[in-house]
Amino acid sequence: GNWEHSNILRVKKPIDEFAVEKNIGVDELKKILINCNKKLLQERSKRIRPLLDDKIILGWNALMNTACSKAYCATGRDEYRQLAINNMNFMLSNLKGKDDNAYHHTFKEGKAKFPAFLDDYAFLIEALIFLQEITADKQWIEKAKLLTNHVIQNFIEEETGFFFYTPVDQQDIIVRKKEVYDSAVPSGNSVMAYN
């Protein structure tokens, strides 16, 4: 197919159907395709590889964790439940900050960096609540309560009751903003209200 003046290779029909149309044996066609793939990969290896952004983001992982819990509720498939538990254990142990309730925003190459934002905490708390619902293990709800208290202590604006996007002790910002409108994902304030 053609996309933005470039050719994108795609398969339009099953191999066996194409082989019959072209009067070629299926095994012979598979050998031809394997040889073509080798040539294409050789040419591709000559190109500069695109940059790879493989950092782990706390909020995004928490969103995925909630999705796994919901998938378990909908399907009863235990692999979703186990994935949610394993992912939560990873987040709680690898993204932990200077104290038990402070977390980092990203994790890459064995290092957690940057203080977590409001939405990171909000999505993490939400994921903990859903995880407690599917496991009946009270450790998750207890951690959600501790993190909620941490958010209230470190993010709240007393006059309005809204939460700032950054913690009170973050020094590398000029102005602390509040996000109160939802976009592609709900704002941290919306999720905290739901939690």
State where each predicted segment sits:
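Glycan-recognition and catalytic cores of secretory/periplasmic carbohydrate-active enzymes
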Residues: 1-195
